[in-house]
């Protein structure tokens, strides 16, 4: 195991249990809090100016470092807006891609090597135009130049990118909530937990169906999200199999692999659908698949996420099947609320 992964696991253990390292790192957490507060106050007081786009902006992000399930929420937000007559475009950092000075703008079947894993998946799932660049205002400007019909921008991540003014903030968390409630590196938080009181909605990736919380006046809208597998699609040729077919296979001949922020969540989703692979392979997030990690897997069929499937295609392994999922929300009125909120906040 490489050094960065070992350090990450050590930190995560300290976040859960405490210990000598947490005590040692407390001064750094205090420094994190100071830097975050100064940056936010600079924008709130006008000392630093945020750039405002000529169209509404929805930011989907988190305060918990690591994978909480933002990408499915971004996809669902785009689809909900499309269903209500909006023409959304998406901006993203393009993690792991050397974009260069100018933003990269595309649409449709984008390559992960050119745009990043999440942007490629979002573009394929929604058909929305997408621009990638670390500087969010620059990405929005390029997106609107290339696609002037876009009338709302959805920012994939970017809650902490305050240089881009936003009209709606949606935070995605999982059942870990705010963890131990401490800032990096003593805890998992990029911003203080109190930041959640300022956002418009909090979506909890519950992993299973859950009822929506009753809206409270003046508080963020609270709802749950979970992923529901629909079918599997072979990576090499697009052939499909039903969930019942997969569940009927002998577990000993079935494997599952995931190179996402929280691989265990993917394996749990399969189990809830009655699919119990005997072999599971947890890979690092944004795994490149430059070489096949499946060579030693003794399985007739290997299930992967849709995000992994984009990069697995080059492996030309007929055992690989991408599990397609639908995003379910506990709040049936979320899309109407989001659309109405955006229209109310338009100048």
UniProtKB/Swiss-Prot annotation:
Catalytic reaction annotation: a lipid A disaccharide + ATP = a lipid IVA + ADP + H(+)
SUPFAM superfamilies in the record: P-loop containing nucleoside triphosphate hydrolases
EC number(s) recorded for this UniProt protein: 2.7.1.130
Pathway: Glycolipid biosynthesis; lipid IV(A) biosynthesis; lipid IV(A) from (3R)-3-hydroxytetradecanoyl-[acyl-carrier-protein] and UDP-N-acetyl-alpha-D-glucosamine: step 6/6
EC supergroup of this enzyme: transferase
Record-level GO BP terms: lipid A biosynthetic process; lipopolysaccharide core region biosynthetic process
GO cellular component, one term: plasma membrane
Molecular function terms from GO: ATP binding; tetraacyldisaccharide 4'-kinase activity
Amino-acid positions noted as binding ATP in the UniProt annotation, renumbered to this chain: 64-71
UniProt KW keywords: ATP-binding, Kinase, Lipid A biosynthesis, Lipid biosynthesis, Lipid metabolism, Nucleotide-binding, Transferase
Top-level taxon of the source organism: Bacteria
UniProt function note: Transfers the gamma-phosphate of ATP to the 4'-position of a tetraacyldisaccharide 1-phosphate intermediate (termed DS-1-P) to form tetraacyldisaccharide 1,4'-bis-phosphate (lipid IVA).
Family (UniProt): Belongs to the LpxK family.
Protein's recorded name: Tetraacyldisaccharide 4'-kinase
Organism field: Bordetella pertussis (strain Tohama I / ATCC BAA-589 / NCTC 13251)
Gene from which the chain derives: lpxK
